[in-house]
């Protein structure tokens, strides 16, 4: 079964092989990294009339990494943190192997795949400070579970290694045009030096199990509360990695939004204010790693079709400009202001948390 050519019948056959028979209705969902399908079932499974089947990109994760992600999701669900965990697969026909305890990962038809419940919702609207505080409480609860033990197999955020890997991949692959290469390389090396210096200054840095890619597109608002449905990028890293993508604007606006998030977050986890200085370094790393991700996936026809601008002189010129802006931003915001939420962040008492209508109680 060719990963890039998965069709509805192949998806139905794969689900049927683990005891989930579809009724013929299959809808492909948006996903660049994996192939994801919504499938309606003939008979409901664990109360679900439709499920989401995820076929993992070959070579992207090891079995151990996928199972560790599944285990984390199940642990969060057991702690009543609103996530959509993988479903336990009921059986395996000959030729299909089930992995995990309980079994949540199927290996068969030349692929690895898992199944979860379908979960609908809308993107959060965070103009309301109350919604920001609510989202902060949600992330705080997720981190309260995440800090109990480290990931063994998932990625551990390492700015030096991650940045250098992205830089090497882009240079060795010849993705940067000769006309843009000198200016881009200079900006990139200067930016990575600033990133590494910021992380060095924040040591010792406490890390924990994270969502890893916590932006508004990965958070669903449902029944008056936030949920997450995608833990593909779960990693070990500093708490701020799950917070910084939820704030935007100039320095003052971001500081205010972060303070509001932390009013909720601090009810469950203390926050090390030194990590505020990592927001712009993390943004810089994300920019560079995004370019490297596009480069790594360029042989997949989906990527040239959806990212035609990648590799053009204009793209790299823009990247150079943005990297220079990030160098300045790191210098200007090496330490963000500590706001009035500090007493909540540093005096968190999980036993007295107020759920305040989150839907967690």
What are these regions (language model features)?
Residues 42-151:
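ATP-binding pocket architecture of kinase catalytic cores
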Residues 18-40:
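ATP-binding glycine-rich phosphate-binding loop
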Residues 1-22:
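Juxta-kinase regulatory segment immediately upstream of eukaryotic protein kinase catalytic domains
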Residues 239-270, 286-302:
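Active-site activation/catalytic loop segments of kinase-like enzymes and analogous catalytic loops
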Residues 58, 109-126, 168-176, 290-309:
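A glycine-centered beta->alpha junction motif in the catalytic cores
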Residues 174, 292-361:
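ATP/Mg2+ or Mg2+-diphosphate-binding catalytic cores
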Residues 125-183, 205-207, 307, 361:
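A cross-family kinase active-site recognition segment
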Residues 33-53, 86, 193-243, 351-361:
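Active-site acidic catalytic loop and adjacent metal/ATP-binding pocket
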